[in-house]
Design a protein with these regions (language model features):
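Short S/T/G/P-rich N-terminal loop/turn motif that feeds into the first structured element of a domain
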Residues: 1-50, 59-68, 77-104
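Glycine-rich, phosphate-binding/catalytic loops in enzymes
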Residues: 70-72
Length: 104
């Protein structure tokens, strides 16, 4: 498994309500994506940065989504270019499901 942390600075701060509205509008694009295990949307407390943390089955699955077209869509929607940081994710603790998952 791999975790992608995507962040981008906004041209101007947005409220939590506006961030939630924008996130809700893009969320259906990520539903049932091959290889995506979980996605969390993020907004900094000052509203100047937004992004997401996504847990993927593999980097290959993530890179199939984070294409030039995806970057252009983010740029158009938020007015900023996304930055992606990659992290190997060998173990996940899921208290909601009551399980610990180890990467294959």
């Amino acid at each position: 498994m791999i975790t992608a942390i995507v962040q981008f600075a906004l041209p101007s701060p947005i409220s939590l309500e506006e961030a939630a509205r924008r996130f809700q509008s893009s969320a259906p694009n990520y539903k049932n994506l091959p290889g995506l295990i979980r996605k969390f949307y993020l907004r900094s407390e000052d509203g100047r940065r937004v992004g997401g943390v996504s847990l993927w089955e593999s980097r290959q699955a993530a890179e199939a989504v984070y294409t030039g077209e995806w970057r252009a869509r983010v740029q158009q929607h938020y007015g900023s270019t996304p930055e992606i940081a990659w992290f190997d994710t060998p173990v996940v603790v899921d208290n909601g499901a009551g399980k610990i998952t180890k990467a294959a």
